[in-house]
Amino acid sequence: MLEKKMSDERLYLALDLPDVDEARGLVKLLGDHIESYKIGLQLLAVGGVELGQELKAMGKNIFYDYKFHDIGATVEKATRSICSLDANLLTVHARPEVMKSAVLGRESSDLKILAVTVLTSLNKKSLEKIGYHQNAEELVLRRVDQALECGVDGVVAS
């Protein structure tokens, strides 16, 4: 007889679905086999925060993949709001002001901040169009160095 094996809580299942009912159905189907879930922008406006709270009440880990990118004061306050939800992970864009503000906003909570270095959809040509004179690889490496200096917990780099 096979023993029930719990998943590695460091692995997050992306709930990139169009509505919370579909996400709830998937969570129910997976039961205790998955301990950690990512909720992104697609679900944000249709109940993603509330879904995250339901999952936390079930003992699950929550990763809000919201990629904050705003002025420092706004990112700091928004990060503080995410902390009040007892989230485990949050993404922000890897601009120094954004990263520093998110680190400041988390205060003494256990929230881990991940910095998104460069969106995967940006190639050399699209980066040039928005004013960057580096290719994606160079920009990723530069932003990783900045992320380390700013005190975030990890990076999302591809």
What is the meaning of each model-derived region?
Residues 38-47:
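Glycine-rich, proline-tolerant flexible connector loops at the mouths of alpha/beta enzymes
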